[in-house]
């Protein structure tokens, strides 16, 4: 029997909402595991926010968190852990810029640890604050004592966002991703959010790292995702599937698109038909 690596994003891929996971998806992943396939999560979330999915699916495999900045196995010490971060001095420099320009809230993530500032926290970061272990208020001097695996910033204006981008990209070692949303009293005032991370944090690399450990060639990898942070693994997997209706369908180099959306269990549908051989 051919063994596949099934690697998937969480939010917008198998989770239509922050804490919603369909029973069909759970049972499909369990069936794939029972058939001898390797099932792995690759998420922007830290492990503390992903563990309920990991446990509900009954997983015992490696996991990629924080967009590939931290790749590890919760129970197998033989797995070669991968942990990258933004240098400490650059982390502080970015936070100093945010503080000087009234760009709140901003966050630093490393493992399950979260540093945060006061400000309007969206639903995702409200949940993150609840799950963080430990949760630490941002120091007054912005020096968290280590490098951040990921920084999230809410620039106060587009001009400040552009200035921050120029500063970050000038380092030559960090990625800068900007996205826009509709501002409101409960999700922020500017409508701009930014993710800053090491260039070495990449879900495509995470998939390769995990696949190598399990002895599975890339052509036998099934990858599923919906957003910009999934593009690398969707491009490099032999069976890269963008979720129907997603940014990944429009902009990624995924070879395939799911027949159904996240809310319609698009991932489960592919696994059932193509891997488990269940006729629909």
Label every model-predicted segment.
Residues 1-8, 27, 34:
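Non-catalytic pre-domain segments flanking phosphatase-related domains
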Residues 22-128:
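Active-site phosphate-binding/coordination module
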Residues 26-34, 99, 169, 208-212, ...:
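Surface-exposed amphipathic alpha-helices with a cationic face
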Residues 36-40, 60-61, 149-150, 219-220, ...:
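Short active-site oxyanion
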Residues 57-59, 67, 171-172, 236-237, ...:
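Short, structured coil segments at secondary-structure junctions
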